[in-house]
Amino acid sequence: MSYQEKNAMSPIIDALVPMVVEQTSRGERSYDIYSRLLKERVIFLTGQVEDHMANLVVAQLLFLESENPDKDIFLYINSPGGSVTAGMSIYDTMQFIKPNVSTVCMGQACSMGAFLLAGGAPGKRYVLPNSRVMIHQPLGGFQGQASDIQIHAQEILTIKQKLNNLLAEHTGQPLEVIERDTDRDNFMSADQAVEYGIVDAVLSHRGE
């Protein structure tokens, strides 16, 4: 995950999105596949974590809470990580809203993606069997006067400590273990992620 004061919005690639057609009492109604799954309280967090994507995820979380504050939300994650500030806006919203947010890793949850995966509701955090999880310390760079660099260096250390404390809380690992294991890129298999406490179970089949 990266710490940056200014994050350039990653380019949004227009792609062909499948449409779903439903029969209603008023005739046919078509949805794009993501809107249809949103009706089932499913949100996708895919690709780089950045401000635009984070705003979309936060908006969907708030909308689903307004629709039904007592029903679980399912957040599917396939992300290499990204901006700390964007990721924390998603994390704080997950903790703020009333519904439990169940997290599911498909493909990969690295860096901020892994942090959000661990931040799901206790007992409702899952990983698919061939996915990978990676944790590490925040990354960042800054140019400017020596005094400004010192300020930003202190800020990234503060963020590192905050993230480590939260990860320790969600995984049940001692803080010193988290500090050691996030010092460098630390990749885990699905089973290792369960053992570490980032997720609660490996899902191999729908019925589990």
Curated annotation (Swiss-Prot):
The keyword Hydrolase applies. One of its GO terms (cellular component) is cytoplasm. Its main location: cytoplasm. InterPro entries: ClpP, ClpP/crotonase-like_dom_sf, ClpP/TepA, ClpP_His_AS, ClpP_Ser_AS. Its EC number is 3.4.21.92. One of its GO terms (biological process) is protein quality control for misfolded or incompletely synthesized proteins. Fourteen ClpP subunits assemble into 2 heptameric rings which stack back to back to give a disk-like structure with a central cavity, resembling the structure of eukaryotic proteasomes. This is ATP-dependent Clp protease proteolytic subunit. The lineage of its organism: Bacteria, Pseudomonadati, Pseudomonadota, Gammaproteobacteria, Vibrionales.
